[in-house]
Design a protein with these regions (language model features):
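RNase H-like nuclease fold core
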Residues: 55, 65, 77-86, 107, ...
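Short, amphipathic alpha-helical "recognition" segments used to contact nucleic acids or chromatin
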Residues: 129-143
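Conserved beta-strand -> loop -> alpha-helix junction used to position metal-binding or nucleic-acid-contacting
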Residues: 276-283, 288-333
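Short acidic (Asp/Glu) and glycine-rich catalytic loops that position anionic groups and cofactors
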Residues: 21, 114-115, 238-240, 303, ...
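Short, conserved DNA-binding cores of transcription-related domains
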Residues: 1-119
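Acidic/histidine-rich catalytic cores and adjacent linkers
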Residues: 2-17, 336-454
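Short, charged amphipathic recognition helices of the HTH superfamily
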Residues: 142-153, 345, 350
């Protein structure tokens, strides 16, 4: 080990040089260890498949069928296969570039063609190892951009890594997202909160333009879409989970109706335990709930959004600094209307508040009185934490996390990319709510993808 130490204290520059050298040696040692372990695994798998050690004779009279087959005749009898040397290849890993891996080869003795070997460690044409796939999913879930991921990979591997390379690995998760939209929900929540959050997704139009290399490209334009989200609550377990979402063109009742029908078909029905739906007053959600659920569930309007509308109305009626204290008093008393033990008491509180403010702020009073009973529907619920069902604030927190990803991405290049991003963010939130490591969750997702796409 050629490190120059001195009897005296090292300067900062000397110490930096020592640490850099040590890091390089550690990396080289790690790469050699990875290479050795992988080679041992490959040889061990070949020995297990063939059922014999190197140099041991074949048992030609016995059939030993395995999942590897000859690329020519299709034979799967391991006793017809023999070792046929190695081919050399490289592999990109999270530790760096592993060179000169000697991968075992097999030959079929019936037709003397190569046997197609599907090793557990990696596939034949796989450039990047599994740990980099895991890193892509983990990092995207933490809202890191494609450029940030490729920059880190490029530094580790000592070369350039394309944005598409990383993006394709992340977008593989979209398959899991589509599966989650179709699975039957067996454990039905007591309450669901519904809301929409806007996102920009790019799409192609009919206009064709030429790029710098004079290649014809369809012009891409961002389109504002809305993600309809359903957050479920289970009172007995005091847990929450995003049970579904849908990318839609708007919050019109047709889009909400399609989304609610899917939830209904997946088992989210009053017969299975659904008691209430919590929502704000915007869009066509109310009409969609009437169509899909009718009066079989409690339709609770968000109190926070109702009071926000009152605040907006009061700011127009009681303008200026001279009415600042009045506005503050009005809102404090409006919030106190909901400090009640029953629906009847809440209505009495509303009447008292309305009588006090009707002359000074008639529009504010009309705003709170409008559909007031829909904001106190939660009193009909039994055995449910009322703090969960008075507002959509918990779902707003979910949307805040989704917006964090949307702001980082600015816009998504396709619906596939948007679905993959939503799925990863929702899985990360579920991991957080259940005190599970996102690192382990993302690793398992990567294993599942590798299993689904062998």
């Amino acid at each position: 080990m050629s490190i120059s130490f001195s009897q005296g204290k090292l300067s900062s520059e000397q110490r930096r040089g020592v640490l850099h050298f040590v890091q390089q040696q550690v990396k080289l040692a790690a790469l050699e260890a990875i290479r050795t372990v992988i080679l041992d695994c490959l040889e061990a798998e070949v020995t297990t498949k063939l059922g014999r050690e190197k140099g041991a004779p074949r048992k030609v009279g016995q059939v030993r069928e395995i999942d590897w087959s000859c690329g020519n005749c299709g034979c799967k009898d391991a006793n017809q296969f023999t070792r046929d040397g190695h081919y050399h290849r490289d592999l990109e890993t999270g530790w760096g570039h592993v060179r000169d891996l000697r991968v075992p080869m097999l030959e079929c003795q019936i037709c003397h063609h190569d046997v197609i070997c599907h090793f557990a460690v990696f596939e034949k044409n796989q450039r990047f190892w599994l740990d980099l796939d895991q890193d892509a999913i983990f990092s995207s879930g933490l809202c890191q951009s494609l450029r940030e991921i490729t920059e880190r990979w490029g530094e580790v591997l000592g070369g350039n890594v394309g944005l598409r390379t990383v993006n394709e690995r992340i977008n593989q998760i979209e398959v899991r997202a589509q599966e989650s939209h179709k699975q039957t929900i067996k454990d039905i929540p007591d309450v669901i909160q519904l809301d929409g959050i806007y996102v920009t997704i790019q799409g192609q139009n009919g206009t064709v333009k030429h790029d710098k290399c004079n290649r014809a490209r369809h012009e891409r334009k961002g389109e504002k879409m809305v993600v309809l989200v359903a957050l479920g609550f289970w009172q007995d377990e005091e847990r929450r989970e995003v049970i579904d979402w849908q990318i839609a063109k708007s919050e019109d009742h047709e889009e909400w109706e399609t989304f609610l029908n899917r939830l209904y078909d997946r088992g989210v029905t009053p017969e299975n335990g659904l008691q209430a739906v919590i929502r704000d007053g915007s869009g066509g959600l109310g009409e969609a709930i009437d169509v899909v659920y009718g009066h079989s569930v409690i339709d609770q309007r968000c109190i926070f959004h109702k009071l926000k509308n009152v605040a907006d109305a009061s700011s127009k009626e009681l303008k200026g600094d001279k009415h600042k204290e009045e506005r503050k008093q009005l809102m404090q008393q409006a919030g106190a209307v909901y400090h009640a033990e029953s629906a009847e008491q809440a209505r009495e509180n509303l009447k008292t508040w309305s009588d006090n403010w009707r002359e000074k702020a008639p529009k504010s009073v009309a705003t709170l009185e409008r559909d007031f009973d829909a904001t106190i529907a939660y009193f009909q619920l039994e055995g449910v934490n009322r703090q969960w069902v008075r507002t959509t604030s918990l779902l707003e927190r979910v949307n805040r996390q989704l917006r964090r990803k949307f702001r980082q991405a600015l816009s998504f290049g396709s619906h596939v990319g948007a679905e993959a991003a939503l799925y990863l963010q929702i899985q990360r939130l579920h991991a957080k709510w259940t005190d599970t490591s996102w690192c382990s969750v993302s690793r398992n997702l990567s294993f599942d993808l590798a299993k689904a796409n062998p």
